[in-house]
């Protein structure tokens, strides 16, 4: 077996892992959102989290085996990010899972096979760990796999025993480590030595149930949960010193370094830490915003805000003074879009959120940094080593300066912050807030279960009624419970009964009105929290009071559109199973009033012919006027009849079945047409990939078709008018314009180079002779970095033995400097990379490159003459 595994890119590692297990009957599933279903955690923190209900016996899995590459975010070790080799906030966890199917022996065998035969690790480079009491796993590694006993380490419960909580499913685990230095031998192996070992694959064997007394009882159905860190595998296979220098992260770091005008490899450790923090955190924020998390002061929104602010501050620490996060985000989007196309689809939202947060925080920094500097000076003058909690709270309360940022700046100045004092001030502030309101025990964001004793849960009537008389049980303003609300107010209303469908199963909530004696509320959305339907809307007239009797009326036109799109989604899945592959299953969906979106598991793109056939099949079923049959059945009976369930979805003992006989039968709680003919027509707009092994179809149906056609006609007409051609001539005209643009860009680049060369040729007569060498040091006006480099190379070629240093300001506050040295100059001990990096610091930048040719950047254009003057002086001193 090779001890020199082949280089693989991050994307290749991900695909190799998923395909390995797909070939072994595992269903490839898309990464779940970073917003988890589990209410006990803010963010998806592990590859197994989406399957936790299955492991806990709360859901019945559709598949016995699954494999995923799961996006994860953890911030518990945020202070270590950039300071260690492998700590991250964002990471990808590759995993294979068994739900009551294969167990320990097979999981270990496949873990070893993919490590040695697929990724090419030599057995001599691998060490495994087992739980100290797991003799079974120890024997499998020793007897069946053949791992030497000296390279099987028994570890305690803290390291090698997985638990889901104080009670419940649990079990031992076994980890595979890569050994960078097997030549050091097998004696005194210390797996905590991260200079030698890195754990890259964890196999969890869920085989016990732990009761309240701590007793372990074997589970009837044993499960497998594994995790392979993608970034760690990339570090090993790409032979780089840490996770940050892999192709998954380093291009982001390089982008940040380029903006700062510095070179990563020649930077000091403090600068490298800041660059790593930026590289890591930008990955997190891009994926968080792509998963529709918005920055705020609570929950996961606060995590996002904190990460963005850390990016901005570390940008300042490396010399970036203006806004830059959207540029770095573009690099992260480009790296991620092949595996997660939603980041490109959400590009505008990502950049808008970043720009808004960065702009606001820069103002916060400007206001707060000056005061913090004064506080630090005062603390030092007093001989103290701690910033008071009161001072830290003033920064937070008055200037919006986060406590974490105050703590970071304090640490850089060898000070601490009185966090307890800060919290005490915060409690005083909260007390003032509580005094201003009566008891607040109802929030839209949180669970409403605690109100079950005080108000009636909502009875849903929407399957059979479009209007209903109801009682107002609760009114909320910005999540705060109120007894009444006035006209013009945005409110959330809980009714005792409602015809409004609440957002669920991919279908958005109904729209409509709540009205009563002098009251009109426009309902703009409906969401379900526990057993309560929360109606979001605006009071257009009157005063709304708890206990009022009102009429709740949905907008029938919106409901018809949603029903048409939802039933069309069911028909679409049935058509995909019939025409493309019977094994296709739903991976996600969106049913709105104007369109539908259906994500499904499929390892390849559909052909144009398949897309057309699917569309034709759906329209055929619509034309055949199939009547709907709706039943509520026991879950087992529904599945026995062949009803399609969504993998990982939680179902009760009884389920609602939507059946269009001989066409489609699914478990579904949404609203549907009573006959397929009501849909009218169905049109596929697009088919594309959204993740590895997951495709997405977007379509329109019913009344929304007319909106789509009108919009398309308007776009075509606008383009035809703009280009002054007939609609059918547009493709040729656009192709022609694209060709002209490419040619113009090439001509422009050529002209730039020619202009730079022309400017540089005039410098030949300014060459000075120093010893046996000629030197040229000069500033060229408005020359871009690439053309400046070409000019320097040409000048050096003409003078032969010598050195050329050129500088330019291609745009405001951006300096470019190039150094080109002949071999004779190199022999004098001058290296272009080090030389140009040193003089660029005068302009507030840095850079580097090869001994004979190097380039650097800076931010202070006013200092360029000083930098070039220093370059000339240094060259003359060294070459004389």
UniProtKB/Swiss-Prot annotation:
SUPFAM superfamilies (alphabetical): Class II aaRS and biotin synthetases (SSF55681), Putative anticodon-binding domain of alanyl-tRNA synthetase (AlaRS) (SSF101353), ThrRS/AlaRS common domain (SSF55186), Translation proteins (SSF50447)
Q: Does the keyword Metal-binding apply?
A: yes
Q: What class of enzyme is it?
A: ligase
Pfam (any one): tRNA-synt_2c
Q: What is its main location?
A: cytoplasm
GO CC annotation = cytosol
Please state the span of the N-terminal signal peptide per the UniProt entry: none
- Key word S-adenosyl-L-methionine present: no
Cofactor(s) demanded: Zn(2+)
According to the record, cofactor stoichiometry and binding are noted as: Binds 1 zinc ion per subunit.
List keywords of the entry alphabetically. Aminoacyl-tRNA synthetase, ATP-binding, Cytoplasm, Ligase, Metal-binding, Nucleotide-binding, Protein biosynthesis, RNA-binding, tRNA-binding, Zinc
Q: Localized where?
A: Cytoplasm
Q: List the disulfide bonds.
A: none
Q: What is its EC number?
A: 6.1.1.7
Q: Which Gene3D superfamilies match?
A: 2.40.30.130, 3.10.310.40, 3.30.54.20, 6.10.250.550, Bira Bifunctional Protein, Domain 2, Threonyl-trna Synthetase, Chain A, domain 2
| CDD domains referenced in this protein's UniProt entry, alphabetically | AlaRS_core
- BP term (GO), one: alanyl-tRNA aminoacylation
Q: Which PANTHER family match?
A: ALANINE--TRNA LIGASE, CYTOPLASMIC, ALANYL-TRNA SYNTHETASE
What's the domain remark here?
Answer: Consists of three domains; the N-terminal catalytic domain, the editing domain and the C-terminal C-Ala domain. The editing domain removes incorrectly charged amino acids, while the C-Ala domain, along with tRNA(Ala), serves as a bridge to cooperatively bring together the editing and aminoacylation centers thus stimulating deacylation of misacylated tRNAs.
Q: Which family does it belong to?
A: Belongs to the class-II aminoacyl-tRNA synthetase family.
Biological role: Catalyzes the attachment of alanine to tRNA(Ala) in a two-step reaction: alanine is first activated by ATP to form Ala-AMP and then transferred to the acceptor end of tRNA(Ala). Also edits incorrectly charged Ser-tRNA(Ala) and Gly-tRNA(Ala) via its editing domain.
Name this polypeptide is given: Alanine--tRNA ligase
Q: Which gene encodes it?
A: alaS
């Amino acid at each position: 077996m090779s001890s020199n595994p082949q280089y693989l890119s991050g994307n290749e590692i991900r695909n190799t892992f998923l395909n390995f297990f797909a070939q072994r009957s595992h269903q490839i599933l898309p990464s779940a959102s970073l917003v988890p279903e589990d209410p006990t955690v803010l963010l998806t923190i592990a590859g197994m989290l989406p399957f936790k209900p299955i492991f806990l016996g709360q859901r019945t899995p559709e598949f016995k085996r699954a494999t995923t590459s799961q996006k994860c975010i953890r911030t518990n070790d945020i202070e270590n990010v950039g300071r260690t080799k492998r700590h991250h906030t964002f990471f990808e966890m590759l995993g294979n899972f068994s739900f009551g199917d294969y167990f320990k022996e097979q999981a270990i065998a496949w873990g070893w096979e993919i490590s040695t035969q697929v990724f090419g690790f030599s057995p001599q480079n691998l060490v495994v760990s087992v739980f100290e009491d797991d003799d079974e796993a120890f024997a499998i590694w020793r007897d069946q796999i053949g791992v030497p006993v000296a390279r099987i380490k028994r570890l305690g419960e803290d390291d090698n025993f997985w638990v889901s909580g104080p009670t419940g499913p649990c079990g031992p685990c076994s980890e595979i480590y890569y050994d960078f230095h097997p030549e050091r031998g097998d004696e005194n192996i210390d797996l905590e030595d991260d200079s030698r070992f890195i754990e890259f694959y964890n196999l969890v064997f869920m085989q016990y149930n732990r009761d309240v007394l701590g007793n372990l009882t074997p589970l009837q159905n044993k499960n497998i949960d594994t995790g392979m860190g993608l970034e760690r595998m990339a570090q090993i296979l790409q032979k780089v010193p840490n996770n940050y220098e892999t192709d998954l992260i380093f291009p982001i770091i390089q982008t940040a370094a380029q903006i700062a005008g510095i070179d990563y490899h020649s930077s000091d450790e403090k600068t490298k830490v800041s660059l790593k923090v930026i590289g890591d955190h930008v990955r997190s924020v891009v994926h968080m915003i792509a998963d529709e998390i918005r920055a705020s002061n609570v929950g996961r929104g606060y995590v996002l805000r904190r990460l963005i602010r850390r990016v901005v501050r570390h940008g300042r620490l490396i010399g970036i003074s203006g806004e830059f996060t959207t540029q770095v985000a573009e690099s992260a989007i480009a790296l991620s879009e092949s595996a997660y196309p939603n980041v490109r689809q959400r590009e505008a939202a990502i950049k808008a959120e970043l720009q808004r947060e960065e702009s606001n925080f820069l103002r916060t920094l400007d206001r707060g940094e000056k005061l913090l500097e004064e506080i630090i000076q005062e603390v030092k003058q007093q001989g103290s080593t701690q910033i008071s909690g009161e001072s830290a709270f003033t920064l937070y309360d008055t200037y919006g300066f986060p406590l974490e940022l105050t703590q970071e700046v304090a640490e850089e100045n060898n000070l601490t912050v009185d966090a307890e004092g800060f919290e005490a001030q915060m409690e005083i502030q909260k007390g003032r807030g509580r005094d201003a309101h009566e008891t607040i025990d109802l929030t839209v964001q949180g669970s409403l279960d605690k109100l079950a004793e005080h108000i009636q849960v909502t009875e849903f009537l929407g399957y059979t009624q479009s209007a209903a008389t109801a009682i107002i049980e609760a009114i909320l303003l910005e999540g705060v419970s109120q007894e009444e609300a006035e006209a013009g107010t945005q409110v959330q209303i809980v009714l005792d009964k409602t015809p409004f469908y609440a957002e669920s199963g991919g279908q958005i909530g109904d729209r409509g009105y709540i009205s009563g004696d002098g009251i009109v509320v426009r309902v703009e959305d409906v969401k379900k929290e526990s057993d309560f339907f929360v109606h979001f809307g605006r009071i257009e007239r009157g005063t709304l009071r708890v206990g009022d009797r009102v009429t709740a009326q949905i907008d029938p036109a919106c409901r018809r559109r949603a029903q048409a799109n939802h039933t069309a989604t069911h028909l679409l899945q049935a058509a995909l199973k019939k025409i493309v592959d019977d094994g296709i299953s739903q991976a996600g969906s969106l049913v709105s009033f104007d369109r539908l979106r259906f994500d499904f598991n499929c390892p390849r793109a559909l052909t144009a012919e398949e897309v057309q056939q699917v569309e034709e099949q759906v329209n055929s079923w619509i034309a055949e006027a199939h009547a709907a049959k709706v039943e509520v059945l026991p879950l087992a009976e529904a599945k026995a009849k062949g009803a399609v369930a969504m993998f990982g979805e939680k179902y009760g003992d009884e389920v609602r079945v939507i059946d269009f006989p001989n066409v489609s039968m699914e478990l579904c709680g949404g609203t549907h047409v009573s006959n397929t003919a009501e849909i009218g027509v169905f049109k596929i707009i697009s088919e594309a990939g959204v993740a590895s092994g997951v495709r997405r179809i977007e379509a329109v149906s019913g009344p929304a078709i007319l909106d789509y056609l009108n919009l398309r006609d308007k776009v075509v007409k606008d383009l035809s008018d703009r280009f002054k051609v007939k609609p059918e001539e547009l493709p040729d005209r656009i192709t022609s314009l694209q060709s002209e643009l490419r040619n113009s860009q090439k001509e422009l680049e050529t002209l730039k180079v020619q202009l730079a060369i022309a400017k540089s040729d005039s410098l030949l007569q300014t060459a000075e002779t120093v010893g046996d060498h000629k030197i040229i040091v000069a500033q060229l006006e408005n020359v871009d970095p690439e053309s400046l480099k070409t000019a320097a190379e040409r000048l050096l070629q003409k003078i032969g033995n010598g050195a050329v240093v050129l500088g330019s300001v291609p745009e405001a506050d951006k300096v470019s400097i190039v150094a080109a040295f002949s071999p004779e100059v190199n022999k004098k001990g001058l290296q272009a990379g080090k030389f140009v990096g040193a003089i660029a610091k005068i302009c507030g930048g840095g850079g580097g490159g090869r001994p004979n040719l190097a380039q650097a950047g800076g931010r202070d254009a006013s200092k360029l003459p000083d930098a070039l003057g220093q370059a000339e002086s240094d060259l003359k001193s060294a070459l004389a």
